[in-house]
């Protein structure tokens, strides 16, 4: 197990009252959190969102991406479902870090797409490690989920980590004129699915 559960507390939100649980990676001491809602002890697959940290989208309301509205929509879907989990995966900027993300934005301002910008800075298109999220689910005693995502790579990695994904639930929100190139690039180069149906 790559991390351990270290703290928890009640977290009232606009959408409902969650439990916030903090986790710390054993080797790096990086922190991640999970928000859980409702009774998760049943046998039905749990609606789950893995949301990668995005300070600019989540907290500063940037329209360069769809992250902020994905976060709020996922929390709403979970409360409407009556149970669920949101893992806040703290690997900013597809895990290149906040300052490099700002550098990548500057390159995008000069014509690069989101993948090219990362590569120009010496990174892979996506540096994230989703096995951490699988370990969080295991620490929560969750084996079977319905995953809120447009990214099939998350499903593949979770399945390899022995988390059963029974359904991909699309989360297609937040497209606007300022992020349309970004979303098109994610579909073309990163394989994200912006269809209502799982493929």
Swiss-Prot record:
Its cofactor is Zn(2+). GTP binds at residues 49-53, 70, 92-94, 114, 149, 154. GO terms for molecular function: GTP binding; GTP cyclohydrolase II activity; zinc ion binding. InterPro entries: GTP_cyclohydro_II (IPR032677), RibA (IPR000926), RibA-like_sf (IPR036144). It holds the Pfam family GTP_cyclohydro2. Pathway: Cofactor biosynthesis; riboflavin biosynthesis; 5-amino-6-(D-ribitylamino)uracil from GTP: step 1/4. It catalyses: GTP + 4 H2O = 2,5-diamino-6-hydroxy-4-(5-phosphoribosylamino)-pyrimidine + formate + 2 phosphate + 3 H(+). Zn(2+) binds at residues 54, 65, 67. Keywords: GTP-binding, Hydrolase, Metal-binding, Nucleotide-binding, Riboflavin biosynthesis, Zinc. Transmembrane segments: none annotated. Binds 1 zinc ion per subunit. It is an enzyme of class 3 (hydrolase). One of its GO terms (cellular component) is cytosol. The active site is at 126 (proton acceptor), 128 (nucleophile). Its EC number is 3.5.4.25. GO terms for biological process: riboflavin biosynthetic process. NCBIfam families: PRK00393.1, ribA. Belongs to the GTP cyclohydrolase II family. Catalyzes the conversion of GTP to 2,5-diamino-6-ribosylamino-4(3H)-pyrimidinone 5'-phosphate (DARP), formate and pyrophosphate. Homodimer. This is GTP cyclohydrolase-2. It comes from Blochmanniella floridana.
């Amino acid at each position: 197990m790559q991390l351990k559960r270290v703290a928890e507390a009640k977290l009232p939100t606009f959408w409902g009252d969650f439990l916030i649980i903090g986790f710390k990676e054993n080797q790096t001491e990086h922190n991640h959190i999970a928000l859980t809602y409702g009774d998760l002890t049943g046998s039905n697959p749990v609606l789950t969102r893995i949301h990668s940290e995005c300070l600019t989208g989540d907290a500063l309301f940037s329209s360069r991406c769809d992250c902020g509205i994905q976060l709020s929509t996922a929390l709403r879907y979970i409360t409407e479902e009556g149970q669920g989990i949101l893992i806040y995966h703290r690997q900013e900027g597809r895990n290149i870090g906040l300052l490099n993300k700002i550098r990548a934005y500057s390159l995008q301002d000069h014509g690069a797409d989101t993948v090219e910008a990362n590569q120009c800075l010496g990174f892979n298109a996506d540096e994230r490690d989703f096995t951490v999220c699988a370990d969080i689910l295991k620490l929560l005693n969750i084996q079977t989920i319905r995953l809120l995502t447009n990214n099939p790579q998350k499903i593949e990695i979770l399945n390899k980590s022995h988390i059963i994904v029974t359904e991909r639930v699309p989360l297609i929100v937040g497209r606007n004129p300022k992020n349309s190139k970004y979303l098109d690039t994610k579909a073309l180069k990163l394989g994200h699915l912006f269809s209502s149906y799982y493929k």
